């Protein structure tokens, strides 16, 4: 049995992730889906918790008709590239091939002797979690870029409101940082 590894942050899960996973599932018997930056949430770059991202993946994979040939594994960041692959190896079941669109991830796994497949990227200019988060904050249409089940879930957890609050709080903090320092007069 061949098991593949696919790592992403999924902030949020979008149709590009699902298309990539379709390709991955066509190549292997089982897939380990590593949820990167698992420790991060409630920031503009990582607004959703690991549990929320897992729920998005479960719903989106079910909606897409995937069977249960996958494992969802949280992967907190360690910010130390030289030991990242052994760290991942210690956190997930054994795997044989790595699927990625990230050149650094590809290099790190190749250096450890893994077969690496660069999976096709789909409309990466708009099927990007960064672009989707930007649209959510700006009040622009984003729903057609993510699976319907993920749209419903983001609405359930008030994810757009969370992102907008984070953006508003950041703007306020930046304004405070840019304000001139006033020395009290005595």
From Swiss-Prot:
Per the record, the pathway is: Cofactor biosynthesis; NAD(+) biosynthesis; NAD(+) from nicotinamide D-ribonucleotide: step 1/1
| Predominant localisation class | cytoplasm
Q: What reaction does this catalyse?
A: beta-nicotinamide D-ribonucleotide + ATP + H(+) = diphosphate + NAD(+)
Q: Which CDD domains match?
A: NMNAT_Archaea (cd02166)
Q: EC number(s)? A: 2.7.7.1
Q: Which SUPFAM superfamilies match?
A: Nucleotidylyl transferase
What keywords are assigned to this protein? Answer: ATP-binding, Cytoplasm, NAD, Nucleotide-binding, Nucleotidyltransferase, Pyridine nucleotide biosynthesis, Transferase
One example GO MF annotation = nicotinamide-nucleotide adenylyltransferase activity
A GO cellular component annotated for this chain's UniProt record is: cytoplasm
> Alphabetically, which GO biological process terms does the record hold?
NAD biosynthetic process
Cell location: Cytoplasm
The entry's family comment says:
Belongs to the archaeal NMN adenylyltransferase family.
Protein known as: Nicotinamide-nucleotide adenylyltransferase
